Design a protein with these regions (language model features):
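Intrinsically disordered, charged low-complexity linkers and terminal tails
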Residues: 1-208
């Protein structure tokens, strides 16, 4: 795969192009699941890039591991994380308005809205008020990221949710930004693969 891509595969490359049997084997061996410990896997293969050394040796690796392993019975945490990602301009804190924008952008895409309530129609989804959306965002993903985010997600005055100050010095690093997006994209795709099985999300593609 590395030779065909012309670079080391990231998580999404592995998810997309890995043989199904190999992918399932990785999932069934949690301790050795490279999707849950990607940077450690890359380091072990001797493929860590120079610009990733700071990420690996510092708190950034622990943060990425939190994103890789956070519980996802629903996909609600992902639009919150994308609000922080902010199209590559990482925010240290997000407001309710910024969360709402990211939330609606995510759930307005395709049929993602169905994940809010499997019994809901599209018309009912469109009728949900911004106030109702914000209430759900704060009560569910924001709350649970604070509870299970190992201190990386905190409450800060003037914001709905913030990143720990420990991350401030690294959030502008190219490696941090690239891995942040890669993890979130992977978690979204993997979630929908599991949810729909052989439905609309198809994982396997061929290289070449």
């Amino acid at each position: 795969m590395k030779e065909q891509l012309g670079r080391r595969p990231m998580r999404m490359d592995l998810f997309t192009y890995m043989e199904e049997e190999t992918y399932q084997l990785a999932l069934n061996h949690t301790k050795d699941n490279l999707f849950k410990h990607y940077l450690e896997y890359v380091k072990g293969q001797g493929d860590l890039l120079p610009q990733e050394e700071k990420l690996f040796d510092g708190i950034g690796r622990e943060f990425m591991n939190v994103l890789e392993t956070t519980s996802m019975s629903r996909v609600y945490k992902m639009p919150v994380l994308m609000a922080f990602y902010n199209h590559g301009q990482i925010r240290m804190e997000v407001t309710e308005a910024e969360l709402l924008t990211s939330w609606k952008e995510f759930f307005n895409t395709g049929t993602n809205w169905k994940d809010l309530d499997k019994e809901m129609t599209f018309k009912q989804y469109q009728a949900i008020s911004d106030r109702e959306h914000i209430r759900k965002i704060l009560q569910m993903p924001v709350h649970f990221l604070q509870e299970s985010g190992k201190g990386f997600f905190v409450k800060r005055e003037g914001s709905a949710l913030a990143l720990s100050e420990e991350l401030r010095e690294i959030v502008r690093d190219e490696a941090f930004i690239r891995h942040f997006k890669d993890v979130v994209d992977l978690r979204v795709m993997d979630y929908y693969k599991i949810r729909y099985a052989e439905g609309p999300v198809m994982r396997r593609r061929r290289l070449g």
